[in-house]
From Swiss-Prot:
Residue ranges of every copy of the S1-like domain listed in the record: 1-73
Family in the record: Belongs to the IF-1 family.
Oligomer status and interactors: Component of the 30S ribosomal translation pre-initiation complex which assembles on the 30S ribosome in the order IF-2 and IF-3, IF-1 and N-formylmethionyl-tRNA(fMet); mRNA recruitment can occur at any time during PIC assembly.
Molecular-function annotations in GO: ribosome binding; rRNA binding; translation initiation factor activity
Keywords: Cytoplasm, Initiation factor, Protein biosynthesis, RNA-binding, rRNA-binding
The keyword RNA-binding belongs to this UniProt entry's keyword annotation: yes
The keyword Nucleotide-binding is annotated on this UniProt entry: no
Lineage, uppermost ranks: Bacteria, Bacillati, Actinomycetota, Actinomycetes, Kineosporiales
GO (cellular component) term, any one: cytosol
Chief subcellular location: cytoplasm
Protein's UniProt name: Translation initiation factor IF-1
Signal sequence residues: none
Intracellular or extracellular location(s): Cytoplasm
Function as written in the Swiss-Prot or TrEMBL entry: One of the essential components for the initiation of protein synthesis. Stabilizes the binding of IF-2 and IF-3 on the 30S subunit to which N-formylmethionyl-tRNA(fMet) subsequently binds. Helps modulate mRNA selection, yielding the 30S pre-initiation complex (PIC). Upon addition of the 50S ribosomal subunit IF-1, IF-2 and IF-3 are released leaving the mature 70S translation initiation complex.
Length: 73
């Protein structure tokens, strides 16, 4: 699957789970962002818990919000 143009992918750790499938994620560079689960992860019932290592996609237009696209095993 080709990568999307213009998105920034960065690793992080889930700090806390919030209502409505939102999560607070601390990125590897120390910043904290608000992230939601991607549609494919919802479809396949992939569960995210605090302390999980994840990959977050950030839009260059709003670096304070992101989408969780992968959870490390």
């Amino acid at each position: 699957m080709p990568k999307k143009d213009g998105v920034i992918e960065i690793e992080g750790t889930v700090i806390e789970a919030l209502p409505n499938a939102m999560f607070r994620v601390e990125l590897s560079n120390g910043h904290k962002v608000l992230a939601h689960i991607s549609g494919k992860m919802r479809q396949h019932y992939i569960r995210i818990l605090p302390e999980d290592r994840v990959v977050v996609e950030l839009s260059p237009y709003d670096l304070s919000r992101g989408r969780i696209v992968y959870r490390y095993k």
